[in-house]
A protein has these predicted regions:
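Helix-loop-strand module that forms the ligand-binding subsite of alpha/beta enzymes
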Residues: 1-71
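Glycine-rich phosphate/pyrophosphate-binding loop and the adjoining helix
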Residues: 63-112
Length: 112
């Protein structure tokens, strides 16, 4: 809760996130800590924060209909109240190795 920016770096494994990241998500999603239930449904408590999701994949294109990892992480962060999310995708590296340089460039821009 003290962080201003949450950075998640993950591969896309079989269209989704690795088990270790899912375990972290299960530890972070805590009622009355990171979200709360209301009469109108759950409300995220982590407002005014930013997130960066850095994903890497061999064949899955980030943001495509078969990329459940990025969609899931954006939904999870939104559930917590974090809606300012930037995605850095080093995707389809087995298809186009040049995409790695593009992802590094974007990460460097964000770090500046």
């Amino acid at each position: 809760k003290a962080a201003d920016v949450v950075v998640i770096g993950t591969p896309i494994y079989n269209f989704s996130v690795p088990a270790a990241l899912k375990a972290w998500i299960d530890q972070v999603a805590r009622a009355r800590e990171t979200f709360q239930y209301t009469e109108n449904g759950p409300v995220g408590l982590l407002k005014d924060k930013k997130a960066i999701i850095a994903v890497a994949s061999g064949g899955t294109q980030a943001g495509s209909e078969i990329d459940f990892a990025t969609t899931y992480l954006k939904h999870f962060l939104g559930f917590l109240g974090i809606t300012d999310v930037t995605v850095i995708a080093a995707d389809q590296l087995m298809v186009n190795p040049d995409k790695r340089a593009d992802a590094i460039s974007l990460a460097e821009q964000l770090a500046a």
